Amino acid sequence: ITDDTIFNHLGLCIIDEQHRFGVNQRQKLLTKTARNIIKPEDGKPRAPHLLTMTATPIPRSLQLTVFGDLDVSVIGELPQGRQPIDTRVIRQNDLKEQLYPKVREEINSGHQVYWICRAIEDKPGSETSSVKKQTKKLQELFPKYKVEFLHGRMKPDEKDLIMEKFASGKIDLLVSTTVVEVGVNVPNATLMVISDAENYGLAQLHQLRGRVGRGSASSCCYLISASEK
């Protein structure tokens, strides 16, 4: 969709994770190719066919399925062997009694854990948990386990190395920003912990929760919230 990309005979556009692209981005992809495709019967240009896919449709996308000229296909089943993810809201005061034992239980069972933070590092006046601070804290709490971190400011080869180590089971607990939201598949990860969960949208929480429950083992997602609502 960049200006310097030229399509000569593009007939089909497939947009995965459709909700992550803006309206202008999607429209640009269609309009920039419309002049390059010619209908044999009338000689007029046409836009390419469009297939969009998402598990977390935003309100605009849902409206298009109802009021727009779209054919809709629904995959209503989980892949074979998948189990529902147990999702729970937990308060900061309950971490020691409820969450930390769960982390130990999952790792001792041979499984792995994601821990999501909104910020990379602490900011003055902010109470949001950060990747670097949380990593240090968890390394002190769980000295027997391999705890590493991942965030978007790391070099690509550094990020690839961390994900390779996590996927191969060499990391027990991965503290990360939302860079793991899409495109990550580690079936052995069975516990997702999301700090400051009240600051995320439902679509993003759903995507993050979907990083676990990808194997045959039962999985859990804990949403840590300071809000009483």
Model-derived segments and spans:
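Inter-lobe coupling/hinge segments of SF2-like helicase ATPases
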Residues: 1-229
